Amino acid sequence: MASPTLTLLLLLTTVSFFISSSADPDMLQDLCVADLPSGIKINGFPCKDAATVTSADFFSQGLAKPGLTNNTFGALVTGANVMTIPGLNTLGVSLSRIDYAPGGLNPPHTHPRATEVVFVLEGTLDVGFLTTANKLISQSLKKGDVFAFPKGLVHFQKNNGDVPASVIAAFNSQLPGTQSLGATLFGSTPPVPDNILAQAFQTSPGTVKHIKSKFQPKK
């Protein structure tokens, strides 16, 4: 029989694992509706006065209609996270709707704070993610299919059909964050030096400047 000390050590190790694997900190009360206008800076958002909480803090119609896809990539992500549903604060979940024009692409990106699971509403998609061993895991999806993207790994979705497509994406974080590789590397403020990118991608500074012109920082 294991000693009490060993049993306690194993228990603490198990508990520590589950705590550390949680995408967001656990909630400590029934609800903590985000007080978004507050100037207080914490890891997350402070709670608004419980007496002022209403059902509107937990409600959104933002995913009901398709998003406009008339942009460079032919895709649009509409978020339903703590920024649009403040009642999600501390709950550790959020959703997005992604709409794709025919041939539209949600370009390679990562979610540093969450795992993502997509459910295909309409259309067909080619999706995939890359492991840290540079292995591509890819799949073709159709209406009703589900696919998971592990937390922090680079992934993408492309509409491979000639009709619009859409998915609902679920995340185990109230605010998963998104880093699009192209915009991050070539459209940052201040910019990453041309010589750094040229050496990293084994190309010329002139080519880097040309690519940067496609990713002008937002003003």
Swiss-Prot record:
The terms under GO molecular function for this entry are:
manganese ion binding
Q: Where does Mn(2+) bind?
A: 109, 111, 116, 155
Where does this polypeptide localize? Secreted, Extracellular space, Apoplast
Q: Which UniProt keywords apply?
A: Apoplast, Disulfide bond, Glycoprotein, Manganese, Metal-binding, Secreted, Signal
Highest rank taxon of the organism: Eukaryota
Q: Which residues are glycosylated?
A: 70
Task: Kindly give the Pfam families that the UniProt entry links to this protein.
Answer: Cupin_1
Q: Which InterPro entries match?
A: Cupin_1 (IPR006045), Germin (IPR001929), Germin_Mn-BS (IPR019780), RmlC-like_jellyroll (IPR014710), RmlC_Cupin_sf (IPR011051)
SMART domains noted in UniProt: Cupin_1 (SM00835)
Which cysteines bridge via disulfide bonds?
Answer: 32-47
Q: Which GO terms describe its biological process?
A: plasmodesmata-mediated intercellular transport; regulation of root development
* Cupin type-1 domain location: 61-209
Q: Which GO terms describe its cellular component?
A: apoplast; nucleus; plasmodesma
Q: Which residues form the signal peptide?
A: 1-21
Q: What does this protein do?
A: May play a role in plant defense. Probably has no oxalate oxidase activity even if the active site is conserved.
Q: Which family does it belong to?
A: Belongs to the germin family.
Subunit relationships = Oligomer (believed to be a pentamer but probably hexamer).
Give the protein name, as stated in the record. Answer: Germin-like protein subfamily 2 member 1
